[in-house]
């Protein structure tokens, strides 16, 4: 496609999405639920065919020398597809918040003032690798009464095309416009530049991918952006704590999966429990091949662990998102130092405290400036499905509009409604 053809194509996508968004905004709740249930059924019925399409993407990715974490994110396993189907069903079962009026109060003038939940309109999702994002974005768009334009990575084109076809079939079955979910069918990066500069058609941009992609979109977009740049998540092991529980959680937070943005990248340990805790978690990390980049005090303790992969930590390690079997380790005085360290080096994504001290837990929840803060649970729970949102379209570390996992409410806004009986202002 030349530039003129690309401009015409993206404009056509935007115009069709805008038309579809008006229909979706007034779609009955039953129709949206029907579409989501139909999509769940189609995902299950077509799992073998979807895996064939996904295998083509995986083969091309490996041949192109894509990094292992990117290839891992690209995979559509039967479990991944089942999770997507369950997410659709969970969304279908949730109450429809569109059109609901909240906080209606009568004013001295006699008018009643409240706020109504309404769809954003059209959002454009720009993402890399993970084809399951196609279903997460589409299902949330349907439930929230929006239209969406999906621009997945070129490495996942076959998977995304197959998934989008199923979404459009489900929309048609429910009597909803197929243009409510459209996939950008070109891998030309200039298409992204055009979509993020179309405020007359696109109301919101949600990038989900590498830091370079998100920085570029944040810099060039002419419409609002919901984003997070990094996932430098922390586990802080407090004193006192249940050591066995802390070992289990710290293991899960790091090694359950290395590539997600909610995997723990930094392990902070209170000095009173370091000598007992670090050898135990160090042995597990050593067995699983996790490299530990540690402060001098932690290195001295971990040095006795057989097979431990140890390196001295640098200043950069405290703020690094590894997305790999690497973790930074630091021994601290206690909760004050942990909170200060997290607020300085964290990406404000997800951070957790493991403790038996109620006051420390409450301070951590109040004072750590992150989108999700957890007590005695793995950072891997920072996920829309796990939070009961049905699915998530991304995780926002911004402080305005949406923060944390973005589900249905994050794809809506509130407008004021005023009910009167002929009142006039004096």
From Swiss-Prot:
Pathway in which the depicted protein is active: Amino-acid biosynthesis; L-proline biosynthesis; L-glutamate 5-semialdehyde from L-glutamate: step 2/2
Catalytic activity, reaction form: L-glutamate 5-semialdehyde + phosphate + NADP(+) = L-glutamyl 5-phosphate + NADPH + H(+)
UniProt keyword annotation of Zinc present: no
GO cellular component, one term: cytoplasm
Annotated function: Catalyzes the NADPH-dependent reduction of L-glutamate 5-phosphate into L-glutamate 5-semialdehyde and phosphate. The product spontaneously undergoes cyclization to form 1-pyrroline-5-carboxylate.
GO biological process: L-proline biosynthetic process
Subcellular location as annotated: Cytoplasm
Single annotated GO MF: NADP binding
This protein's name: Gamma-glutamyl phosphate reductase
Similarity comment: family membership: Belongs to the gamma-glutamyl phosphate reductase family.
Enzyme Commission designation: 1.2.1.41
Enzyme class at the top of the EC tree: oxidoreductase
HAMAP family recorded: ProA (MF_00412)
């Amino acid at each position: 496609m030349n530039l003129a053809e690309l401009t015409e194509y993206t404009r056509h996508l935007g115009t069709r999405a805008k038309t579809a968004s008006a229909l979706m905004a007034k779609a009955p709740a039953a129709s949206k639920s029907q579409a989501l249930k139909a999509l769940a059924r189609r995902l299950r019925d077509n799992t073998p065919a979807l895996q064939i399409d996904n295998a083509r993407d995986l083969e091309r990715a490996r041949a192109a020398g894509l990094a292992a974490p990117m290839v891992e994110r690209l995979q559509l396993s039967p479990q991944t597809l089942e999770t997507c189907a369950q997410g659709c069903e969970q969304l279908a079962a949730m109450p429809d918040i569109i059109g609901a009026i909240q906080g209606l109060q009568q004013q001295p003038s006699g008018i009643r003032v409240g706020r109504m939940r309404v769809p954003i309109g059209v959002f454009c999702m720009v993402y890399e690798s993970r084809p399951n994002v196609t279903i997460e974005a589409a299902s949330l768009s349907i439930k929230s009464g929006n239209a969406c334009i999906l621009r997945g990575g070129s490495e996942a084109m076959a998977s995304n095309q197959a998934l989008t076809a199923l979404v459009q079939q489900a929309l048609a079955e429910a009597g909803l416009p197929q243009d409510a979910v459209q996939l950008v069918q070109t891998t030309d990066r200039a298409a992204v530049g055009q979509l993020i500069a179309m405020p007359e058609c696109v109301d919101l941009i949600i990038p989900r991918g590498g830091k370079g992609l998100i920085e570029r979109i944040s810099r060039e977009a002419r419409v609002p952006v919901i984003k997070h740049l990094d996932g430098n998540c922390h586990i802080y092991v407090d004193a006192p704590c249940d050591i066995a529980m802390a070992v289990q959680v710290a293991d899960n937070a790091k090694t359950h999966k290395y590539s997600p943005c909610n995997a723990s990248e930094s392990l902070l340990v209170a000095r009173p429990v370091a000598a007992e805790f670090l050898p135990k978690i160090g042995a597990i990390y050593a067995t699983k091949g996790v490299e530990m980049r540690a402060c001098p005090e932690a290195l001295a303790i971990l040095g006795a662990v057989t097979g431990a992969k140890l390196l001295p930590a640098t200043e950069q390690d405290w703020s690094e998102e590894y997305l790999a079997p690497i973790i930074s380790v630091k021994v601290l005085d206690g909760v004050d130092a942990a909170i200060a360290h997290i607020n300085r080096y964290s990406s404000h994504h997800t951070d957790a405290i493991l403790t038996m001290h109620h006051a420390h837990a409450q301070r951590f929840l109040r004072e750590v400036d992150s989108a999700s803060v957890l007590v005695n649970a793995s950072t891997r729970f920072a996920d829309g499905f796990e939070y009961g949102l049905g699915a998530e379209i991304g995780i926002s570390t911004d402080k305005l509009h949406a923060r944390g996992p973005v589900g249905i409410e994050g794809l809506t806004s509130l407008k004021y409604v005023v009910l009167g009986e002929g009142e006039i202002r004096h």
